[in-house]
């Protein structure tokens, strides 16, 4: 529980004041959660092993934030943050893709320009409130995002496993996260963003043949930068479950028997091979699931490393 956090009362007063207010110690937040750690080790003749498991669940609650009063129940639900968890993701719902211009003409307008910028293959957003118009009033909470600004998933878990047998040893470290989504709307809806390259996903996009007929694809068609606003929104189609399990490290070694090493005046000799970030199980196949969406996924991928070596003791 945290109290007297910095905040400004600017949200409580009309914008006509035309002045900035200094920060005060007025906001409050609360972290809720638990952690479980289980360990076991045993020896069976020459075989030694140990297993350690951990699991944690944490949620962050804005217990109190200085903000203006809600004008109605919808405003309170959509725009206010006091007494609300920080990991709620608001997006448009999914109605698939537009399959033709006729489909666009007979669907609610969603580009604010009478459909002038819409093309077959564009995402078809859900008219969630049923008013016949696709706008900001149609977004709703349907995802668990990275919590706040720290990029932590709601659930974390891991396992450390080690074993030894007649000079051989092995150790493994697994880590994972779950119960959260990422929404990489920039890469998936603006494939040539800022003049950069697009993801390989867009080889399978809606496109026209030489006769002008539309060929269906999994992703929207590409176009010049000025026409991307129709797809440049957070939507269910670009929301991914980022749960993952990663083999973070693994090491295999063998210790040479002392009756052999002492002939060379070596007290202990162990050879080993190790690897880091060996594999990841995840629904995300185009970006690392640990990359927070706040950076739009624009980070260098993690490195897979392999090491070989020996430990000597004289």
Task: Indicate where each model-derived feature is located.
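C-terminal beta-signal and terminal closure region of outer-membrane beta-barrel proteins
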Residues: 14-15, 22-31, 73-99, 209-213, ...
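Conserved small-residue
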Residues: 27-29, 43-150, 189-191, 207-212
